[in-house]
Amino acid sequence: MTKDEDSGTTDGGYSTPDIAVQEKQDQPPAPEPEYATGFRLAAIMSTIFLSTLLAALDIGIVATAIPGITDDFHRLDDVGWYGGACFLLVGSSAPMWGKLYKYFSAQLVYLVSVVIFLVGSIVAAAAPNSAALIVGRALQGWGCSGTLGGSVLMISYVAEPQKRAMLIGMWMSVFMFSTIIGPLLGGAFTSEVTWRWCFWINLPVGGPVIALVVLFFEVPKHIKPAPATWVEILRQLDLPGFALLLTSLVCLTVALQWGGQTKSWSYGSVIATLVMWVVLTIAFFVVEWIQGDYAMVPLALLKPRLVWTNALYGWIANLANFQVLFYLPIYFQSIHGQSAIASGVNSLPFMAFFAAGSMLSGFLIGKTRLLQPYEFASGVLATVGAALLYTLDIDSSKARYIGPQVIFGIGIGLGNQVPMTALESFSKPEHIAPTTGVMLMCNSISGAYFVTAAQSIFANYMLKELASIAPDMDPIQVLTTGASEVSHVFQGAELEAVLAAYLAGIKDVFAFSLAGAAFTVVLSLAIPFKKLPNMFAGPSNGQEEEEGKKDGPAEKKEDEVAV
């Protein structure tokens, strides 16, 4: 070793750090962020809204179509899978889609997700039997997951930072609107044409979506896929983790559909599936820990308190949200004898004020750069609204069921999009895609968990109430009668007993929602009180630079919360 080498210099007289600095100076500067504006932004957002409308419609459209489906296939034991298959794949595949968006062109991955969704729609629409319909619904869920996750990701890619919160709020409003009108369309198609049109209708809408994606989904130049070999990408997809997560969710779904409804909770198969759910869930987290950076849910991403508290907040907030979304129409149809369409119309206050709350929080976040206060306010208002919904009775007036919807809707809307905004805003650019996938997984798996749990709560408490007031009635007949058909199938004392049983089940589901809303208040207090990073691409004047200094050194802030 020469003296120069020993002293950390080369024969040319430059120290190693000097060379590193020189090389860094010689490198071309990173491209300045370019964001979509004007017509291009409007075209991209229109495409995102249309594809979200398409994907979210099918989450709830099958609910009112189930009576017609069971008339054709005569498989009552498969009823839970017609909706559950979609939810299971949306939740379990979300992190996988996040990885695909990281390593491939966002336009290509988005296009593939839409195509998979449309293929699933064709399979479901043309299904000759129940098994084929379930496969079609699973494919729809798989494609839906990529479309919904990609929609949020594209907003973060193409929109200026100060506009993102507002646009994500608008996107959430479209999502909620779609899930509300889904059952309306499902009921209309099933009554007037055939349930198969619940799926055929996706094709004439999906065609223009594909064309719009091809024409307008151009990602800004500063967003580039991460370089990786095919072997590396395959490892990143974490297929063992995906398989364990999916099978654990299937076990839980089966156990909750059996328990107390078609089989006793003490039945061997019910206990076995619950045990398998626990074992597979533990195995999933063990595999994720072993996989490290290759895990579909990299546990390191969840380490910062800002991340895991927001992810948990989003998970629990959807507990409160989904129960009201699905069981408020059941209340209207069963207790008030309304049609599927009328029940949807009477649920519009919830949807309208959810949209208003979402857009309001997006606007306020853009102005104040605060997050936690809106999550706290969201939890408080949602708790009050859920408590009022719990008080609904058989003879409740319009004012009694519209007022709580307004409070609950604006409450849930205020906080629903905040966790996604927080995680995307505090993530490093290369981590935005997988972080979005993890957040979507939390939101979707909460649907898979809690919608199934709510169905079990509803059925078990309804049957318990029915057994106490009308022990001679056939519980299977009550379970298999559609909510809108209750007043037609039962009369007199039987109808009174069934309505009382339905109300008992619905109130317990609303109590479940109330517990979730109250828990979000507690969770919001654990979320770090931090302002978003400067929402502009870079300081353009002294005032913004000074504001950045007030927030503290950028490097320190990134160390604390960036993922």
From Swiss-Prot:
UniProt entry keywords in alphabetical sequence: Cell membrane, Membrane, Transmembrane, Transmembrane helix, Transport
Localization (cell): Cell membrane
Source organism of this protein record: Aspergillus sp. (strain MF297-2)
Main location: membrane
Family the entry assigns: Belongs to the major facilitator superfamily. TCR/Tet family.
SUPFAM superfamilies reported for this sequence: MFS general substrate transporter (SSF103473)
Membrane topology: Multi-pass membrane protein
Source organism, top-level taxon: Eukaryota
UniProt region (Disordered), positions on chain: 1-32, 538-563
CDD domains: MFS_Azr1_MDR_like
Pfam families xref list: MFS_1
Described purpose of this protein according to its UniProt entry: Efflux pump; part of the gene cluster that mediates the biosynthesis of notoamide, a fungal indole alkaloid that belongs to a family of natural products containing a characteristic bicyclo[2.2.2]diazaoctane core.
Protein name: Efflux pump notK
UniProt biased composition (Basic and acidic residues): 547-563
One GO cellular component term: plasma membrane
Transmembrane segments: 48-68, 78-98, 108-128, 138-158, 165-185, 197-217, 239-259, 270-290, 312-332, 345-365, 374-394, 406-426, 438-458, 509-529
